[in-house]
Swiss-Prot record:
Source lineage: Bacteria, Bacillati, Bacillota, Clostridia, Eubacteriales
Enzyme nomenclature, EC number: 3.-.-.-
Organism: Clostridium acetobutylicum (strain ATCC 824 / DSM 792 / JCM 1419 / IAM 19013 / LMG 5710 / NBRC 13948 / NRRL B-527 / VKM B-1787 / 2291 / W)
Domain of life of the source: Bacteria
Name of this chain's protein: Uncharacterized isochorismatase family protein CA_P0030
Alphabetical list of PANTHER family matching this protein: ISOCHORISMATASE FAMILY PROTEIN YECD, PEROXYUREIDOACRYLATE/UREIDOACRYLATE AMIDOHYDROLASE-RELATED
Pfam families registered for this protein in UniProt: Isochorismatase
Gene3D superfamilies in alphabetical order: Isochorismatase-like
Amino acid sequence: MENLEIEKTALVVIDLQKGIVAGEHAPYTGKEVVEKASKLVKAFTDKGAFVVLVKVSTIDGKDMLKPKLDSEINQIKRPEGWDSYVPEISNIKNTYAITKRQWGAFYGTDLDLQLRRRGIDTMVLCGISTGIGVDTTAREAFQHGYNQIFVEDAMTARSREEHAYVCKYIFPRLGRIRNTEEILEQL
């Protein structure tokens, strides 16, 4: 395994916020993902790498996408503080925060601008949910020409099947799949 070029690599953490982490997930719990992701955030920031914390938020819901759906599964409950980053990552210095209004972290944000201005060509992705926020961001990153590494054990989904499908059939077409320990060894 080759070492990561820290000056050209960013860690992008998707939706590790209280209202999403608290949900039911598989194959890993929200707590397990936060534990792995927070190790990555600390290691990347200690090395001086660019770390992006992405969250989904809205003031009143009017700026969120509202397509007609056959399912209500996409409805997020928004109790007070639902969009706050989990404490394990919220106070780590030298991270860049992005707020999105949809699944992916590129559309309607300055993520691409921030990465390009720093000369970053590789993204390490983790977070919740494997098949929604992480997958959509990965597809957008692929279209923008970024190399990608997916940290399989630092992400999770609504079901074991969703996570397995995306990791087996989608991510290998967009980048490389590693685990947390492998990434930490590459720093």
